[in-house]
Design a protein with these regions (language model features):
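Acceptor/aglycone-binding surface of glycosyltransferases and processive sugar-polymer synthases
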Residues: 95-103, 129-167, 182-234
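Short aromatic/hydrophobic "clamp" motif used to bind/position activated sugar donors
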Residues: 119
Length: 322
């Protein structure tokens, strides 16, 4: 196991996306870059996102834009293709592995066809997507020394507390908790939105869990953030949790492979996307807990294997792909 609690950068390295403008990445990068967007019923957002990514491709920031569609019925695949992305149906990737079992499985299968030496996973339902969602993560890998894995953090505005009887409105311009300095003029949450309202499972489950059980990773603001960039060779050595636990599993497994010193986080400021209902969050929280418990069991820190842990795909490098 590579990861150990006592190594350099014990509190991690944090960057702001503005440190990695497109022209810097185009000038400094030495590796091919692929961007992958897993998508399900995202017709309203996927087109504009892909167009921005295609512009970055033309500017020399990246080389490949792939959308992995989950049999969407709203025209997601068609809009992504029209905007310039390569589109593959998730069920067509590694079909010998059986049915696709969620987002993590889709990411694992996508890795089998992505060509870049650096892979960046982004959300296809981001409502306020801008270039910096890609450049911040790609730049951290391409422009900084000794970085294998870059994870996003951001504010996820939720419903305003002012809308709740007795709730107190939150003034705009709240600072990012523990984040890097935000340049003047940077985007702030819209008036009437609670800047801390989103990411409920992250705040109530994932962060306390990591702080208690993996305290050397407690500096990571959002263990459940789905936006990451990583070296392909690293991703190919990792197992992939198939369900909601993929993000926290990836963070822990990257630590085991590379150590905390090669993990960084990047402040992307504000991320807006559709929120799930409270009832939908319970199975998510259960899966996150079971995924962490599985790793504790594998490490010998939990005697019994957890029940309900999602199926995991083996490291892609362990498969004989034809």
């Amino acid at each position: 196991m590579t990861g150990t609690p006592g190594e350099r950068f014990p509190h991690g390295r944090t960057f702001h996306h503005s440190q990695f403008p497109p022209e810097r990445i185009a000038a400094e990068r030495r590796h091919s870059v692929s961007v992958c967007l897993p998508a399900r019923e995202c017709a309203g957002t996927v087109g504009p996102i892909v167009r921005r990514l295609v512009e970055l491709r033309e500017a020399g920031v990246l080389d490949e834009v792939l959308v992995v569609d989950a049999a969407s019925r709203d025209g997601t695949a068609e809009r992504a293709a029209a905007a310039g992305a390569i589109v593959r149906q998730e069920a067509e990737l590694l079909p010998q592995q059986g049915p696709v079992l969620g987002k993590g499985d889709a990411l694992w299968r996508a890795l089998s066809v992505l060509e870049g030496e650096i892979v960046c996973f982004l959300d296809a339902d981001t409502e306020n997507f801008s270039d910096h969602f890609a450049t911040g993560l790609i730049g951290a890998i391409c422009c900084e020394p000794d970085v294998d894995f870059a994870k996003a953090f951001y504010r996820r505005p939720g419903p305003s507390r002012a809308a709740v009887p007795g709730g107190a409105a939150v003034p705009g311009g709240a600072a990012v908790p523990g984040g890097a300095a935000v340049p003047a003029g940077a985007e702030r949450p819209d008036e009437g939105l609670d800047p801390d309202g989103g990411g409920r499972v992250n705040r109530l489950m994932a962060r306390p869990l990591v702080a208690e059980l993996y305290p050397w990773l407690a500096w990571v603001h959002q263990p459940l953030a789905g936006e990451v960039a990583a070296r392909r060779e690293l991703l190919e050595r990792l197992p992939f949790a198939t369900g909601y636990g993929v993000e926290i599993a990836m963070l822990i497994d990257v630590w085991k492979e590379s150590g905390t010193g090669r993990i960084v986080q990047v402040d992307l400021e504000v991320h807006r996307h559709p929120h799930q209902s409270l009832s939908a969050l319970e199975p998510m929280a259960r899966t996150v807990l079971a995924t962490v418990a599985r790793r504790l069991h594998e490490e010998g820190r939990l005697l019994e294997a957890p029940s309900g842990a999602p199926l995991e795909r083996p490291p892609l490098a362990s498969l004989a792909l034809v």
